[in-house]
Amino acid sequence: MAADYEPKPITTEHIVLSDEILELVELLAENAHDIWASERLRDGWTFGPERDDTKRQHPCLVPYAQLPDRDRDYDRTMVIGSIGAILALGFTISHTHSGVDPAP
C-alpha cells in the first residue's frame, strides 16, 4: 500500500433506504452471491465443509438462503454501500414494475 494512500469512501450515513430499496438489497445480495458462486464453480471449485484452496473447496458454495448469517450480511453490506453511494451521488433508483421475474 502506498504510504500516502488515504481511503475516502462516499459518505452515506445520511441516506435512508426505503422498504422497496431494502427488498432490492436482498435481491442484489443474492445475485452477488450467485455471481461469485458461478465463477468459483466455473473455475473447478466444489462445496467442502471448510475452505481448502488446494482442493478448491469452499463451504459457501450453497444457495444464498443456506449461507450463514455472517456471509449473507457481508453481501448485504456490500450492496448497501453501493446503493448508498449511488443515492448520495444524487442518482435515483426506481422500479418500473415490468413484471419481469428476476430469476431465469
Residues of each region from the PLM?
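Alpha-helical propensity feature that highlights long, continuous alpha-helices across diverse contexts
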Residues: 1-104
